[in-house]
Each structure stands twice: as structure tokens, then as C-alpha cells.
Amino acid sequence: MNKRAVAILLVGMISSGMIYFHPVYAHNFGGDESASFFAKVAEIKTEINFISKHVSDSNAIDYYSDALGEYWNANDTREMEERNALLQKEIPATINSTISDARSGNQAAVSTDVSQLNGYLDEAIPVRIDKDKLNNSTVHALAVTFVLKEVLEKYGDAINSTVNLNDISQINMGGNVQQMSVPIVDQLKYENSMGLATAAQQLFNDLAAKNTDKSTSNDKISAALTKLLQDLNNKADRNTVMTDVHIKIHPDLVSAYNIQTVPEFPMPALLIIISIVAMITITRFRSMKLRQ
């Protein structure tokens, strides 16, 4: 391949990158195992509580058992085994017992199961989370964002949204946007989004109570979470709900609790960099051959 061909190829790739490049504005908070586990506990408690409210309802039990399977799987059991063999056994066993008792219509047994599971999950927190992160306010705040991500995912499915509600770039920022109610196409996912939003609010309330020095930010975040629940209850359009989370909650949560966002690297930009490196390499290789 001669230099002219390489140059033409490079120009084409750079042009394509410029055409298709756009910054990703979605809040990407990265991963943190401790925050993920705090969120996981809140999510499991939410789903198991819904099972207790839908005893004998096979459709609801199927839905929430699938949700539980997402939040607690074989990998979670394996990781718990490394810390506590008893909890490694009891947590999945009690989840299964709750589902089984709910299918058989045994409300009393389900209530006992739920109480036991909540106890096991509470025990699991100091077992699974290292001491230096157990009372870390940033970790707890990050857990709130993880649960809110699930809220948006479930609500998007509930209203059959054609866009990803977790992508902030999909918000219509125009001044003429009017709030409106939308039809719910999946009642269970709608119910789930409400329950998870309540769980996120409770997580934040617990966090705020331990961080009274952040009262101004806490008040703003608390008000925004209350509005989110109101808008979900009113079946608000996706733009309203996304604004609640991305514009009203996230910025104050990030600044008040020092959450680090992780910028995403757009693929076209990466393609440009790779192309430049490739051209430099080819040019150097040709120069070496000419010297021989």
C-alpha cells in the first residue's frame, strides 16, 4: 500500500469519525462492588416484598422471580461463600422458599420467609462489604444511582419506550415540552419501577440522616426524589421522568457526595486514533525498507 492510498484511507476514516462522532452524555458512574451490593440488597428486598403481595398470582410471581434471578445469581452465591458459608446457603434457599410458598398460596409462610430473608440480607452487608466502605457516604450515594438506573429501565419497559431512559442525550430539552400522562403497557414493570424508586428514596433518606452537614443538597435531592415518585404515580411521560433523575437528582448527588463519573470513549474517535497510529507504523516500516 503506497503513501497516497494510506492517506486517502486515513482521510476517509477521519471524515467518517467526524460525521458520526457525538459526545455521550449519559451518566456513567462506573462500577463499585460495595455500592452494587448495597443496591442489590435494596433491590432484592423490593422484589421479595412484591412477591408477598402477589401470593397465588402466577404471572406476578413469575415476573418477580425472574427479577430476583437477575439480582441474585450463582456468582453472588459463590462470592458470598468466600465470606460466609451459612449466608451463602441461606440467602438463595430462602429466596427459593419464598417463591415456592407464594406459588402454593401460603401467605403465612411467605411472610415468615420474607422476614428471614431480610434478616439474612442485613447480616450479609457487613460480611460482604469491607469496613472502609461500609460507612462511606460516596459508596452509599453511588448505590442510590444504581437503583435509580433500575427504576428508569423498568419504567421504560412499562411504557414501551423506544429509547433508553438511562441515556440523558435522549431528553428533549426544548422549552415547549408539556408534561403528559402515558399509557402503561406492562403493569408489573410499572409497579416494579415504583417500588424501586421508593427503595432509592429510602436509601437516600438513610444516607442524608448520617450527613446532616450536606443539608442544602440533601433537601434538593429529597425533593427531587419525591417528585420522581409523584411523576411515576401519575404515569408521566418519559421525558419528565428522565428529567427528574438526570437533571434534578444526579447533579446534586454527584457534587454533594463526590461521585466520580466515568466518561465513555466514542468508537469513531477511537477509530481515528487507531488509524493515525496505523499510518505512522506503515510510514516507519516503509522508511526502514528504503534504508535497507
Predicted segments with their positions:
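Short alpha-helical segments used as structural interaction elements across diverse proteins
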Residues: M1, F37, A42, T281-T283
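Short, Lys/Arg-rich N-terminal segment immediately upstream of the first membrane anchor
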Residues: M1-N2, Q260-V262
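Positively charged n-region of N-terminal signal peptides that target proteins for export
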Residues: M1-R4, S287-Q292
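Hydrophobic secretory-pathway targeting helix
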Residues: N2-A26
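Sec-dependent signal peptide cleavage junction
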Residues: M18-D32, T261-F265, R286-M288
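Mature extracytoplasmic or organellar-lumen-exposed domains after removal of signal/transit peptides
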Residues: Y25-T261
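Alpha-helix boundary/interfacial micro-motifs
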Residues: N73, I280-T283, R291-Q292
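A cross-kingdom C-terminal cell-surface attachment/processing module
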Residues: M267-S287
